[in-house]
Amino acid sequence: TISLNKLNMTQYEQFLTPENFKLAFVRLKTSSRNLYKTIYYEDLRIFGLYLDENIESTINQVKNEIYKPEKSHKIFIPKKDNLVRPLSILTFIDLLIYQAMTNVIADNSYDVIAPYYDNLIFGNIVNPSTANVLDREFFFKSWKRKWKRFNEVSKENFENGYKYLSEFDIASFFDTIDHNILCEILANTFKIEANILELLSKCLETWTADSNHKTFKSKHGIPQGPISSPFLADLYLFYVDTEIKKLNKKYDFKYSR
């Protein structure tokens, strides 16, 4: 059982608990098996052999400001449109710390974004801190259930007289997410504390860099591959959701993503 008593704890203190890092480890382990997970699967197994000791060591590195994120390695996956999708391969420690940070961000942002779940937002829905123990081991709720719900809502819209469907895709979305804007949204809308955001910003800037290009750094882009990234991308889009919801009062249309 992994539980986290948040009473009288700052978000940074929540982040640095062994319980949170164990939860991060379990969530990496329970994530869907895909190419990205295959790459770090052996690291998961080895780290788990001495899990408590390795987590304690990792937390101490962060507490004592010894921890430094490392530049990612990039691999490129062909897409159907003849373009490529870049995957950012992080070290396992970086990946674990990223997930541990995102656990805290997810728990502390949930009450703000939850009213949009199953209403406007149907993908990448996180399990809240109030979920049962087994569900909490998974970062996201079952995508199959959410896909079913999305199709049900779409069908209802057509049955209610809406005739036209427009689909949009943001080109190179992950690569163009501005770190400063992301941190402003996390701070102002979701009340994430400054020291969490400082570490997140430092990590994202480093991971955006490519190990093959020693001097290149960027203030935009989040790593594709880790399960933390689509959740942060959803929080980044939250402003769009709220603005479109305002337009919905003036124009008769339905919006979902």
Residue ranges of predicted features:
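Active-site-proximal segment of RNA-dependent polymerases
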Residues: 107-167, 172-178
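Conserved polymerase palm-domain catalytic core
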Residues: 151-257
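Catalytic micro-motifs at enzyme active sites that drive phosphoryl/nucleotidyl and oxygen chemistry
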Residues: 63, 72-76, 84-90, 148-158, ...
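Conserved pre-motif C helix in the palm subdomain of viral-like polymerases
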Residues: 84-120, 174, 219-247
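Short, flexible active-site-proximal loops enriched in glycine and acidic residues
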Residues: 67-73, 111-117, 253
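Non-catalytic, polymerase-adjacent accessory regions of viral genome-replication enzymes
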Residues: 2-80
